């Protein structure tokens, strides 16, 4: 996989007096090796995947040459990065109720240098989602969905856990040619974008509350 033009950009943008963001014109392509297994039976599907990324392109930090007190958020090449993922997806139909349940587990195998020492970034994570659809008379459809992401490592980052619930109602008209709906996302405003980024000279923590509604 070749790096994108955005990743190769040579410009810098200013976040604050200690942090800049920019590209890396010295990036080289990465090579991916994937091994996948999928099994399907009626409304149940299982998957298993192993990925080996050689010369992997990933998010990182580095020192700003003109000022050692400033770090640059950028992308770089890492010798290798490995992932093992497993998934299960269930989608039965029970009368007017059509639920969908998804379970995903990701186990990374990766190391970074953080404040002078090697740090394992091997914390696995689980992602769950449950989607519920009720097919009511007169073409009314009610939906109630929930998802949960556990804490885990993604590259040089530790992603904090989050969860959320969405609800909606839809109705179709004119033999399903027109659909009108009302949707409410993230009812409890709980899908936070918090993470920790581990670099050679610093550990950066960000807690964000995006407008996911």
What residue spans do the PLM features occupy?
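Residue-level detector of the transmembrane beta-barrel scaffold of outer-membrane proteins
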Residues: 1, 8, 36-38, 45-47, ...
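Outer-membrane beta-barrel signature, preferentially recognizing the C-terminal barrel domain
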Residues: 2-51, 73-84, 207-213
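Outer-membrane beta-barrel proteins
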Residues: 23-29, 34-36, 72-78, 89, ...
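Conserved C-terminal beta-signal and adjacent last beta-strands/turns
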Residues: 123-213
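Transmembrane beta-strands of outer-membrane beta-barrel pores
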Residues: 1-2, 12, 41-43, 50-54, ...
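Outer-membrane beta-barrel translocator domains and adjoining extracellular loop/strand segments
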Residues: 4-12, 18-21, 52, 56-65, ...
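Residues on the lipid-exposed face of transmembrane beta-strands in outer-membrane beta-barrel proteins
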Residues: 27, 35-41, 86-94, 103-105, ...
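Gram-negative outer-membrane beta-barrel transporters
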Residues: 52-54, 70, 76-147
